[in-house]
Amino acid sequence: MNEKYPIGEFQFDGEITNIIINEWINEIEDLPRLLKNTVIDLNNEQLDTSYRSGGWTVRQVIHHLADSHMNAYIRLKLAITEENPVIKPYDEKEWAELYDYNLPIEISLSLIEALHKRWCSLLRDLSPTDMERTFKHPESGSISIGKNIGIYAWHGKHHLAHITSLCKRKDW
């Protein structure tokens, strides 16, 4: 198994249908519960274990999910309210070294739970036309709301798999 990409990289070349979008939204909606159930019984030593050599700790992954998904939520709102806005990328590796990544995971678990409720509520209210709206990433180009939903459904599962595969390897 590839420890960096345990579920593979995001790939989707087909037509983004309402059925697929609803599946992706369900996956985004389920992440807070799945994440909490996976990490709730881990101790500090386990939380401060890297999921792979040179990779983030479990604690950093959890805080990263909060930061990344907050950015996704803001990008969604920008794409809904502006014409193909240029979004600001951030240096996730540098963010993972900031002090707040040492805080208890419960803070980010609560944030992720609340954020995903708002995010999924907004996503479920979008029309098929809204799904075609875009934002522009300076490196990746224009990305539709529909595709970005898929990217973030994958993103949550990707990082959850980092944690679950570590727990399995360590027999936690």
UniProtKB/Swiss-Prot annotation:
Cellular component GO terms, alphabetical: cytoplasm
Residues that bind Zn(2+): 64, 155, 159
Listed EC numbers: 3.-.-.-
UniProt cross-references to Pfam families, sorted A to Z: DinB_2
Cofactor: Zn(2+)
SUPFAM superfamilies membership: DinB/YfiT-like putative metalloenzymes
Cofactor: how bound: Binds 1 zinc ion per subunit.
Keyword Zinc: yes
UniProt key word Metal-binding: yes
Keyword terms, alphabetized: Cytoplasm, Hydrolase, Metal-binding, Zinc
GO molecular-function term, one example from the UniProt record: zinc ion binding
Subcellular location: Cytoplasm
Role this protein plays: Possible metal-dependent hydrolase.
NCBIfam families: PRK13291.1 (NF009807)
Assembly and binders: Homodimer.
Family: Belongs to the metal hydrolase YfiT family.
Name of the protein: Putative metal-dependent hydrolase OB0782
Record organism: Oceanobacillus iheyensis (strain DSM 14371 / CIP 107618 / JCM 11309 / KCTC 3954 / HTE831)
Upper classification of the organism: Bacteria, Bacillati, Bacillota, Bacilli, Bacillales
